[in-house]
Swiss-Prot record:
Connected disease: Defects in zdhhc21 are the cause of the depilated (dep) phenotype. It is a recessive phenotype characterized by variable hair loss, with thinner and shorter hairs remaining in a greasy coat which is due to a defect in the epidermis, rather than the dermis. Depilated (dep) mutant mice are protected against endothelial dysfunction in systemic inflammatory response syndrome. They are also tachycardic and hypotensive.
GO biological process: adrenergic receptor signaling pathway; hair follicle development; peptidyl-L-cysteine S-palmitoylation; regulation of establishment of endothelial barrier; regulation of leukocyte adhesion to arterial endothelial cell; regulation of vascular associated smooth muscle contraction; sebaceous gland development
Function: Palmitoyltransferase that catalyzes the addition of palmitate onto various protein substrates. Palmitoylates sex steroid hormone receptors, including ESR1, PGR and AR, thereby regulating their targeting to the plasma membrane. This affects rapid intracellular signaling by sex hormones via ERK and AKT kinases and the generation of cAMP, but does not affect that mediated by their nuclear receptor. Palmitoylates FYN, regulates its localization in hair follicles and plays a key role in epidermal homeostasis and hair follicle differentiation.
Alphabetically ordered keywords of this record: Acyltransferase, Cell membrane, Golgi apparatus, Lipoprotein, Membrane, Palmitate, Transferase, Transmembrane, Transmembrane helix
GO cellular component: Golgi apparatus; Golgi membrane; plasma membrane
Protein name, as recorded: Palmitoyltransferase ZDHHC21
Extracellular topological domain: 38-44, 155-185
Family per record: Belongs to the DHHC palmitoyltransferase family.
Gene Ontology molecular function, alphabetical: palmitoyltransferase activity; protein-cysteine S-palmitoyltransferase activity
Protein encoded by which gene: Zdhhc21
Length: 265
């Protein structure tokens, strides 16, 4: 199933996403320029570490772009409701359209989204049934890339041997300390924020509960898993092959699951 393009016109979301792209570009340029390539040239680190760094960076960027542009599960104006599932649908009191239960109307986007988790300004898009898996990959690779960059920043000053060849004519070399301090500040800030977000997302999937459902307290026991964790993750990622859960380049094939909780509606 191909991914439908979904573009949200929201200046606030553009600014938030632009900030994320800036942090990504800053680290993808500064860390290799100051740390990776100089230490590789002097034999302090193997080249595979540079390949891994760029690999994680590419996966992170692909997940960001696809999570931002993929239709999260917007409902059509005249959906075809299977006769056997009519009791699982309800009328939205904001847009007056029929929708599956567990859908939610996003006031910022102006339409209902299937199994909507929340609207995320950092990707300028809703997180719903069709792009939740990409959002999880974005959280994972952002955290991995941040840890990788912070680790090399620490090793650059406290573990690696001092560099013998330094071109002081380069701007990044003359102002290395200030540049690396800014990179460390952004990295620590990003790591703290993304760790909390990633944790809540994982708990939500394990308990089969969206963020909106948690906030509205519509579930009696949101902390008790109602399905095996392998099943809930497979439903989100659209495959039971765990290795594919980490690949942002593929297309998601949704598993046939109902849009409701057994005891939540």
């Amino acid at each position: 199933m191909g991914l439908r393009i979904h573009f949200v016109v929201d200046p606030h979301g553009w600014c938030c996403m632009g900030l994320i792209v800036f942090v990504w570009l800053y680290n993808i340029v500064i860390i290799p320029k100051i740390v990776l390539f100089p230490h590789y040239e002097e034999g302090h680190i193997p080249g595979i570490l540079i390949i891994i760094f760029y690999g994680i960076s590419i996966f992170c960027l692909v997940a960001l772009v696809r999570a931002s542009l993929t239709d999260p599960g917007r409902l059509p104006e005249n959906p075809k409701i299977p006769h056997a599932e009519r009791e699982l649908w309800e009328l939205c009191n904001k847009c007056n359209l029929m929708r599956p239960k567990r859908s939610h109307h996003c006031s910022r986007c102006g339409h209902c989204v299937r199994r909507m988790d929340h609207h995320c300004p950092w990707i300028n898009n809703c997180v719903g049934e069709d792009n939740h898996w990409l959002f999880l990959q974005l959280c994972f690779y952002t955290e991995l890339l941040t840890c990788y960059a912070l680790m090399f920043s620490f090793c650059h000053y406290y573990y690696f041997l001092p560099l013998k060849k330094r071109n002081l004519d380069l701007f990044v070399v003359r102002h290395e300390l200030a540049i690396m301090r800014l990179a460390a500040f952004m990295g620590i800030t990003m790591l703290v924020g993304i760790t909390g977000l990633f944790y809540t997302q994982l708990i939500g999937i394990i308990t089969d509960t969206t963020s909106i459902e948690k906030m509205s307290n519509c579930c009696e026991e949101i902390s008790r898993p109602r399905k095996p964790w392998q099943q809930t993750f497979s439903e989100v990622f659209g495959t039971r092959w765990k290795i594919l859960w980490f690949i942002p380049f593929r297309q998601r094939q949704p598993l046939r699951v109902p849009y409701h909780f057994a005891n939540h509606v």
